[in-house]
Regions:
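Intrinsic-disorder/low-complexity detector
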Residues: 1-118
Length: 118
C-alpha cells in the first residue's frame, strides 16, 4: 500500500462492502482508482479484485467464492488468509496477480480483525 490514506480508503471500501452499502462502496472504490499504489500493474490487479468483490456482493450469486465462503469462524479466516497470502507471494505471479491476491488477503485480514473486535 502506498500511504496511510490509501489504506484508510481500502478499509472504508471493506466497511461499506460488508455493511452492504453498495453505493458507498462504489464511491470508496472510485477514490481508490485515483490513488498511487506504486506499481500500475499491481494497482490494476488490486482494483480488479475489489470490483469483483463489489459485483459479487451486489448479486449475491452463491456460485461466487465471496458469497459462499465461511467468514464466521476464525479458523476459516486463518485458512483463507494463509492461502491468499501464499498466492500473493508466489514468484511466478505477475504484479497484476500479486495485486489481485493481495486485495483478497487484505479483505480476509479486515474480516479477521473485525471478528476479533466483536
Amino acid at each position: 500500500m502506498a500511504s496511510k490514506k490509501t489504506r484508510d480508503d481500502v478499509i472504508a471500501f471493506f466497511e461499506t462492502l460488508t455493511a452492504r452499502r453498495f453505493s458507498d462502496a462504489g464511491k470508496a472504490l472510485n477514490e481508490l482508482r485515483g490513488k498511487n499504489f506504486g506499481n500500475q500493474e499491481f494497482k490494476d490487479g488490486y482494483i480488479m479484485a475489489l470490483e469483483g468483490l463489489l459485483l459479487s456482493s451486489r448479486t449475491g450469486d452463491d456460485r461466487d467464492f465471496y458469497n459462499r465462503a465461511e467468514f464466521e469462524t476464525q479458523k476459516a479466516l486463518n485458512n483463507y488468509k494463509k492461502e491468499f497470502r501464499s498466492f500473493a507471494k508466489e514468484d511466478i505471479n505477475s504484479s497484476y496477480d500479486t495485486g489481485f491476491f493481495q486485495a483478497w488477503s487484505d479483505l480476509i485480514q479486515y474480516r479477521s480483525d473485525n471478528r476479533k473486535k466483536s
